[in-house]
Amino acid sequence: MPSYFRRAAVQHALGSVSSYQTRLEQWKAEGQKKGKPYLESKQYAMPVFYHDVMYRKNTEEKDAAFLKLYDGRGWKWFAVRLKHTDMEYLRKHWSGKKASAPTLEKKHDKYFLRFTYAEEVSLNRTPVKEQTICSVDLGINTDAVCTIMRPDGTILGRKFINFSSDKDRMYRVLGRIRRFQREHGSRQAQGRWAYAKRLNTELGRKIAREIVLYASEKKADVIVFEYLEMKGKLSGKKKQKLQMWRKRDIQKRCGQQAHRKGIRISRICAWNTSRLAFDGSGEIARDTRDHRLCTFQTGKRYNCDLSASYNIGARYFIREILKPLPATERSLLEAKVPAVKRRTSCVYADLRELISEMELRKAA
């Protein structure tokens, strides 16, 4: 085995041990009794093809490269053809960026070369009073509802993101799996479940791309999501689990794509964002036939996910406005607007009331 492969294996082992020691120290510092981290001995590390010694570009062909591989007798250079569309994507989006050594990757019993690039990006430092945010509600009936909001509660734009055909395809696959499992059992349906998960992952990619694209078009400084509990096992039907996994994947992908554009990511408490009406009238009543719509206690008909996106953006600004204030000034504002004390029940109407109260205090 070449020394370069041995060096990569040693570096991977050092990184795994260092990560384990860090997690163990954090676990001891928190004083927890359960969830003690452990060192996984089987890492399944893939080899790294270092430049010039294990990997070389093909100067004669654009979509080809040379890899040093073992043919049973010795290590020799072999020409490998790369997919034209993948190489065009790299040339279009990553030309001029610092490229790291490619790594071998195995997915679905196939091997791929994973190319990694390094890029320095500075996140924006826009003050809260000048920020424009994109609050996102990841729903069930509608994939995502985005609202562009200013600190005073002004709504600059709204967008409904929904890939209905992709969801219908996935739900048809789930229906076939359910009928198949009734006849043959769940053990023989693993391949079908893997296909459903791949459809779910692809749907998450599309939704995340649309969210970041819309936030970038509207020049948003922050994308605000609900905080989703990421620990523990998920209970419920497999369909519900797929929806939760997709929401987690969307938030993760949005964070990665938004940071490349200098956009920050923030999360707020998810309690009651969909249950409470944005106008402060109280709990909503969802329609039994069309779950996208609801009725406020005032009799107003509105979209549930759009109301939730208003509340998500309002909670972000309430938190960011009150957090840097001195304790005395914050207490006076909370006395005038008692609803902002509990972040689990704040709605869009409370933000408007808080802003008006702050303006009155400035005028006085």
Q: Which role fits each region the language model picked out?
A:
Residues 1-364:
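Nucleic-acid substrate recognition interfaces
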